[in-house]
A protein has these predicted regions:
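Membrane-entry signal-anchor segments at the cytosolic-membrane interface
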Residues: 1-6, 146-152
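Hydrophobic alpha-helical transmembrane signal-anchor segments
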Residues: 1-18
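Extracytoplasmic/periplasmic regions of membrane proteins
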Residues: 21-145
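Pore-lining and gate-forming transmembrane alpha-helices of multi-pass membrane transport proteins
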Residues: 225-233, 262-279, 325, 329, ...
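Helical hairpin unit composed of two closely spaced alpha helices linked by a short loop
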Residues: 282-349
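Hydrophobic alpha-helical transmembrane segments of membrane transport and translocation systems
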Residues: 333-408
Length: 408
């Protein structure tokens, strides 16, 4: 059965692997790039309080009707570090999230810079989008965070290897493979307009096959966990498909999705949402299944005379405890990720049921519930599979003589 699933996954990868032409056709780079736009880095020399071009505005949201929305801005004096303008000093406006990010002198920004000549060339095509003021100023694309992110990554890798040793190192290799699958298969296939559910099923299955065998070794124990994981993935896919359809979710629950929808018509956003639900549930699902399989094997090693049924019953007691903690993990993870949304909806002062039916919060609810159902069902499935694959019990006579079942 497992061999058939692995073979089907390989066939699915071949059939769903996106062509380079399809991805290029859907790419946004050529369609929305502005000729002459450069992205130099710049060091902050000083930050001064300033005013936005539109310091305040009246909100169009009926929940905040008549209330002014104050926009605080700072002005940063910066020195451009690279490109044709290296060494040049200029000023940029810091608004929105940049004012709350704790920027200080010597921090590095990524700028958007359009030369005067390029602005002249683009003026005919962009109409009034390029003004005289915009030609002589630079915008901030974001903060350069390479160094702190690299330090965090190094610390993470060091801790994993120090504690997990060889197993930890193999887990990092497996994590790298997972990232490659997402970058080179899942994302391009979604961009090319493929089915989100099919892409998630094939991609998640391929990831789990490699990750489990690489991180935990090739054994019957790992195979039991893999079978349980693959069944859990299938359950999550089916539940997610039904949940997204019946709750009438569009998949456009955040600003990024709406911006993306305005730029391309190739992506199926409901499929994208379904794919995201499945991929997001992989980690905790894998955690539960590998733990259950290990519990079954350790119970057999500790009590070789127990029958498969007795081991299944005892392993399910362990599994129920794991289910409780895993459910908390899922709920708190999604609640933490959606904290800003929760605060915003709280400020609306609406009944809780009304709040929960908003698209952005409904998406989080569907993600949590779908992952939770798949996780809970994977526990008994994995337990039964692992117990079925166990070597038979040792008779009391053989157990007294020190005989032990052969475990792998």
């Amino acid at each position: 059965m497992l061999a058939l699933v692995i073979l089907s996954t390989g066939v699915g990868l071949v059939l769903l692997w996106p062509s380079r032409d399809a991805v290029d056709d859907a790419s946004l780079a050529d369609q929305f790039a502005v000729e002459g736009m450069t992205y130099p880095t710049a060091r902050i020399d000083a930050i001064n309080e300033g005013e936005c071009e539109d310091q305040s505005a009246v909100s169009d949201d009926p929940a905040f009707s008549g209330q002014s929305v104050v926009q605080h801005c700072d002005i940063a004096e910066v020195t451009i570090l690279d490109g044709a303008r290296a060494g040049e000093r200029t000023t940029v406006q810091l608004g929105g999230s940049l004012t709350a990010s704790g920027l200080r002198p010597d921090d590095t920004l990524r700028l958007m810079s359009l030369s005067d000549s390029a602005a002249d060339d683009q003026e005919g095509g962009l109409g009034s989008a390029v003004t005289e003021n915009e030609r002589s100023s630079d915008g901030v694309l974001g903060v350069v965070r390479n160094v702190p992110l690299a330090i965090l990554a190094i610390v993470f890798i060091g801790v994993v290897i120090a504690v997990g040793m060889l197993r930890g190192f193999l887990a990092l290799i497996a994590l790298g493979f997972s990232a490659m699958m997402v970058i080179y298969f899942v994302l391009p296939a979604l961009i090319a307009g493929g089915s989100g559910t099919a892409i998630a099923l094939v991609g998640a299955s391929a990831i789990m096959v490699v990750v489990l065998y690489l991180a935990h070794g090739v054994s019957m124990r790992t195979s039991a966990a893999l079978l349980g994981t693959l069944i859990g993935i299938g359950l999550m896919a089916g539940i997610a498909q039904v949940a997204v359809s019946t709750t009438r979710l569009s998949g456009l629950g955040d600003e990024t999705s709406n911006v993306l929808a305005s730029m391309t018509s190739e992506i199926d956003f409901r499929g994208l949402l379904t794919c995201g639900i499945i991929i997001a549930g992989l980690g905790v699902l894998n955690d539960v299944t590998i733990t259950q399989a290990s519990s079954v094997w350790e119970l057999r090693a500790a009590a070789p005379g127990l029958t498969r049924r007795e081991i299944s019953v005892r392993a399910m007691r362990i599994g129920r405890d794991h289910i409780a903690s895993a459910i908390y993990t899922i709920v708190f993870a999604y609640a933490g990720a959606a904290m800003s949304v929760l605060i915003l909806l709280y400020l609306y002062d609406q009944p809780m049921l009304n709040v929960l039916t908003q698209e952005d919060l409904s998406i989080e609810a569907v993600r949590t519930i779908t992952s939770g159902i798949g996780l809970v069902l994977a526990v008994p499935v994995t337990t039964w599979i692992a117990a079925w694959l166990l070597p038979p019990a040792v008779s009391p006579t053989n157990e007294a003589s020190g005989a032990r079942p052969r475990l792998r």
